[in-house]
Every structure is written in C-alpha cells, then in structure tokens.
Amino acid sequence: MSVKAYFELVRIHNVIGSAISVFMGYVVASEWKIVPIKLILAMIVVSVIAAGGYIINDVFDIEIDKINKPNRPLPSGRIKISRARSLSIVLFLVGIVLSVLLNIYAFIIALLTVLALYYYAKDLKKQGLVGNLIVALTSALSAFYGGLAFFEGSWVIRTLIPTLYIFFFTLTREFVKGIEDVKGDMTNGVKTLAVRVGIEKTWFISKIILVILIVTSFIPYFFGFNIIYLIGILFLDIILILVVLLRHDIESASKARAYMKVYALGTLILFALGTLPI
C-alpha cells in the first residue's frame, strides 16, 4: 500500500483542479472579498466528494480499465477493491457533513452530487450522453459551489458565466475521452458518442462546440473582466486550435484531452485573475 497509489486512485491532479474551480467561483462571486473559513470549507467539501467520486468510478469501472488502463491502482491490484469502496463512502460522508456548515443549499447540492456520482459510476456511465452530461454538470458545479459558499449580492449572475463555460468544455472533453477509450467501451457495452456515431462524427461535434466556446470566450471581457483575462484567453485559444482542432484520430485524442485539461486549468486561473481590481 503506497500513498502514490492512493493519489493516483483519487486522481489528485483532478481533485486539485476541483479545488481551484471552487476558489475561482468564490473570488468571481465575491470580487475577491474573501471570508477564509467559507472558502476553505467549500474547497474541502468539493475536494473530498470529487475524490470519492473518482474512487467509486474506478470500482465500477474495473473491467473496462483492465483493457483501457491496466496499470491503474485497482486493475493492477495495488489497492483492494473493498478498501477503495470503503474509502469512497467515507469521503462522501465527510463532504456531506461538512457542507451543512455552509448553508442548506450547499448541503442539498453536495448530497445530490454524491448521488449523481454514485449512479453515474454504477449505471449511467454506460448510457453515453447521459453520463457525459452528469460529468459536465458535476464539474461545473465546483465553480458554482464557490459562489454558493459566498452567497451574497449578485453571486449567481457573476458565477454563471464560468459555470456554463466549464459545463460545455467538460462535455466536449468527455466526448474526446470517448474517442480515446472507444475500444474498451465497445467491448463493455458503454454507449458513448464515439461508439454510437463513430470517431469522425464525434470529433466533428466536439470541434463545433470548441469553436463556439472559443468565439464566446471573449464575452467575459465585455462584462467587466480585466485585460489579464483577455490576453490570457487569447493565448490559450490559439494553442487549443493548434493542438485540438487540427487533430482527428484516436492517437490524437489522448494528446488533445491532455491539453484540454491544461486549458481548463488555465481558464480557471484566468477567470479568477480576470476579476482582480486593476
């Protein structure tokens, strides 16, 4: 049993990304008027629930991962399934209990998110588009949760733009992931978009959404975001076009999805910096 295996199991880089998303949502909603206890608590709630979600997903996904990702902690035997299942339950419970300390709405969203993550891993993932929508929604809720933790003034309006952006970007990334995993998904009956309509059409749909996101990525600047956001998003968009939009095969999917993670993290940072009073 190694700490590294558990970090890999919970996808620690994704968990950190979720925490950053909460931070971004909070500072965008509050315009950097930070109440540390609220922010830290919200980041912990989202992080532990996200970690629990990644674990339970691997528990239910072990047969697919034996084909697609045999070196993951569970299919490789580095961590026992029973231990992973127990850890996911503990993390879910910790997140739900801590959410009560924020407000009733934070508790409700935390509870619904846990249920969504569990049933996504258990059944809904195999439904393809429905599963993709759940992943996109729960990812976007990380940013929304940051605004919810602030819960003052026009927090909903201020948090809505990054929340919607994260939703559609994550949805596209899930489509690309389906291209990467198409072989194992076909074997295990997972009805992803790539399995249903083919790789070429899935790439086309993904690129259409990305083009729309690129075109609309400048809108926040006209709603008060600063010049840091404008310059940064222009740079990220150019790289996105070169790395993702010009690719179209399975081999490219892995590289494209890897950059999309970097792009998503960069966008979160830019949303936060874009609300700095300069």
From Swiss-Prot:
It comes from Sulfurisphaera tokodaii (strain DSM 16993 / JCM 10545 / NBRC 100140 / 7) (Sulfolobus tokodaii). GO terms for molecular function: geranylgeranylglycerol-phosphate geranylgeranyltransferase activity; magnesium ion binding. GO terms for cellular component: plasma membrane. This is Digeranylgeranylglyceryl phosphate synthase. The keyword Transport does not apply. One of its GO terms (biological process) is glycerophospholipid biosynthetic process. The chain crosses the membrane at residues 15-35, 36-56, 89-109, 133-153, 159-179, 203-223, 225-245, 258-278. Its main location: membrane.
